[in-house]
Amino acid sequence: MLGFGLRYVSAAEAGELLREGRVGLVPTETVVGLVAGKAGLSRLFEIKGRDSGKPIALLCGAAEEALALGREPPPPLARSLAGRFWPGPLTLVLDAEGGGTVGVRVPAHPVTWAVLASHGGQLYATSANLSGGSASRALEEVDPAISAAVDFAVRGEPGSGEASAVVDLSGGNVRLLRATKSLTEDELMRLAKG
């Protein structure tokens, strides 16, 4: 159930609120996203009850934008996977400039795209559930503790309910961290072999 007094806003207003450091709920093609801009990142971790040292994905508006967040040049398999699955439910973990890793995704949901465009840059995103809890397909399913803590929600068609596939290409590896119906270990290995 959605929290009492949850404020529904347009994608354009959501972009403005995110630039101000607010945190919100946005539908994606997978599960409901808990999103924030850079100014709201610490609050996002607080709302989710997640250790700020844990990785979080960045949503981007285009494949080139997402791949540019990793060390240049991106691995050839990253380009191949991006071409096949983006926009869509795939998170790539890449080596980041200056060390560490970065998880990037280009969503396919029109509302998510509109919020990204309005925000004018990448958004930090995670599933809208308490750390360790189940992800929600629709806004109405979001844990009341989450919906009560966020600043806004943007309405839109619910996603599939299946979280995105996650492929780790950091350190020269090819590891499937989360399989989906559309990307299995066998399919990833076939794509990796070219």
Model-derived segments and their meaning:
Residues 1-194:
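Active-site-adjacent structural elements in enzyme catalytic cores
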